């Protein structure tokens, strides 16, 4: 669905762990879900976002003792995988973390696409650099400010998603939708948005049931199709900021991803009715 990009990256592996963690939760195996999510996080960090959902389910079914088991399983997996690297090459591990956290605002990210759009439409000057991670980013105080604001917004949006799930979730569809939501939140507010990140969404969005699931799946297909307009063959024109229409396409694609987030968090009619009956019990984005 992403053309040549999907053949040269390993994002399928964390996606498999993530969907396996969701499947474990659907079958009531919260501790296993924590372990699977932690294993996926050692490949790409995003599956760790599923652990709070698993802990919520463990709390509902077994209280603090079950939560402790879930946390223990996640920590054990992380220690088993990352522990040897921390012992053999601690500086290498900390350097890898530094490289990831210090990266510039990647040009395809939602935040950077606003800069690119302004450059294409109004001629706003941009300073694009090659980052240590091999991607292209926007440098400068404005980009750093946007990166910081995105980090705060991500933390707030994730917290809201978890609170909403804790207060309002009623069944398997809500669990799958919550899992997809936190991953989309991560993509929207991250300072990096590589096209292969969309692989993460495919299994989660397709699992969502009902009309919301159909609409979300249709929108995701459109997002994948639009991404192929500029990736990989027109990407060079984009990071060089030499072809305005490519910047417009990237901006439009990112607006669609934001729209996907809006679709996932929009209250269902039943949830809206619950808010009217008991506003203290029902909570969420909407």
Regions found by a protein language model. Name each.
Residues 1-96, 143-286:
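Multi-pass membrane glycosyltransferase architecture that uses lipid-linked
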Residues 95, 103, 134-136, 191:
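Flexible, active-site-adjacent loop/turn segments at secondary-structure boundaries
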């Amino acid at each position: 669905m992403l053309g040549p990009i999907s053949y040269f990256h390993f994002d399928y592996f964390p996606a498999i762990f993530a969907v396996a963690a969701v499947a474990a939760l659907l079958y009531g195996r919260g501790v296993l879900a924590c372990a699977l999510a932690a294993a996926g996080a050692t490949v790409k960090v995003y599956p760790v976002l599923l652990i709070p959902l698993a802990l919520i389910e463990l709390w509902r079914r077994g209280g603090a003792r079950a939560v402790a088991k879930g946390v223990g399983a996640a920590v054990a997996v992380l220690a088993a995988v990352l522990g040897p690297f921390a012992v053999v090459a601690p500086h290498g591990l900390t350097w890898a973390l530094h490289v990831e956290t210090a990266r510039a605002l990647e040009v395809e990210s939602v935040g950077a696409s606003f800069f690119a759009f302004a450059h294409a439409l109004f001629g706003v000057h941009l300073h694009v650099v090659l980052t240590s991670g091999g991607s292209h980013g926007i440098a400068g105080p404005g980009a750093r400010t946007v990166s910081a604001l995105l980090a705060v917004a991500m933390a707030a949006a994730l917290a809201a998603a978890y609170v909403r799930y804790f207060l309002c979730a009623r069944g398997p569809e809500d669990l799958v939708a919550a899992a997809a939501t936190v991953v989309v939140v991560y993509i929207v507010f991250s300072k990096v948005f590589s096209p292969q990140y969309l692989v993460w969404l495919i299994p989660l969005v397709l699992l969502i049931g009902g009309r919301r699931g159909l609409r979300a799946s249709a929108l995701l297909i459109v997002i994948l199709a639009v991404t192929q307009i500029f990736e990989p063959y027109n990407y060079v024109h984009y990071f060089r900021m030499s072809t305005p229409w490519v910047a417009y396409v990237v901006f439009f694609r990112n607006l669609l991803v934001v729209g996907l987030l809006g679709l996932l968090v929009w209250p269902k009619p039943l949830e809206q009715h619950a808010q009217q009956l008991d506003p203290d019990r029902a909570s969420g984005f909407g």
